[in-house]
């Protein structure tokens, strides 16, 4: 049983830390890997609002250590009640590791 708990704690995962001040959301995607990795990181931001639609994409290759949360970026987004915003983070080593996570968990 303890081995299963330890494995679960060390699982590869992408998480988001989010703070809000008024309509400004600061979103910080973090990745924790159980093996070190030279990975391709892609962050896609899609926004639909009264003023139109915008897409922003960042791609970079990072050397990520194992077993510690690493901040991948820091995005500040002004989101009004009429806006729909989706941020998708993908981390891949091009072989066996492929993680993808969306913020917010279910699109607004």
From Swiss-Prot:
Where does the UniProt entry say this protein principally localizes? Answer: periplasm
Q: What Pfam families does UniProt report for this protein, alphabetically?
A: Tafi-CsgC
**Keyword list, A-Z:** Chaperone, Periplasm, Signal
The yes or no answer to whether the keyword Transport is present is no
Q: Where in the cell is it found?
A: Periplasm
Signal peptide span per the entry? 1-8
User: What happens biologically when this protein's gene is inactivated, per the record?
Assistant: Cells lacking this gene make aberrant thin aggregative fimbriae (Tafi) which are composed solely of CsgA. Normal Tafi are composed of CsgA and CsgB at a 20:1 ration.
A GO term (biological process) for this protein? pilus assembly
- What protein name applies here? Curli assembly protein CsgC
**What induces the gene encoding this protein?**
Expressed at low levels in agar-grown cells, part of the csgBAC (agfBAC) operon.
| Family label | Belongs to the CsgC/AgfC family.
In the UniProt record, which is one GO cellular component term? Answer: periplasmic space
What this protein is reported to do is described as:
Plays a role in the extracellular assembly of CsgA (also known as AgfA, AC P0A1E7) into thin aggregative fimbriae (Tafi) fibers. Assembly may also require CsgE (AgfE). Tafi are thought to be assembled via an extracellular nucleation-precipitation (ENP) pathway, and possibly also via an intracellular non-CsgC-dependent pathway.
Gene this chain is encoded by: csgC
Instruction: Give the source lineage, highest ranks first.
Output: Bacteria, Pseudomonadati, Pseudomonadota, Gammaproteobacteria, Enterobacterales
């Amino acid at each position: 049983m303890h081995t299963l708990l330890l494995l679960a704690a060390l699982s590869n995962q992408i998480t988001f830390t989010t703070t809000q001040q008024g309509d400004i959301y600061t979103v910080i995607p973090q990745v924790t890997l159980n093996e070190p990795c030279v990975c391709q990181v892609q962050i896609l931001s899609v926004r639909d609002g009264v003023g139109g639609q915008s897409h922003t994409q960042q791609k970079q290759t990072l050397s990520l250590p194992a077993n510690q949360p690493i901040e991948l970026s820091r995005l500040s987004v002004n989101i009004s009640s009429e806006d729909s915003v989706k941020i998708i983070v993908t981390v891949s080593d091009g072989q066996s590791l492929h993680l993808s996570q969306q913020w917010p968990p279910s699109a607004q």
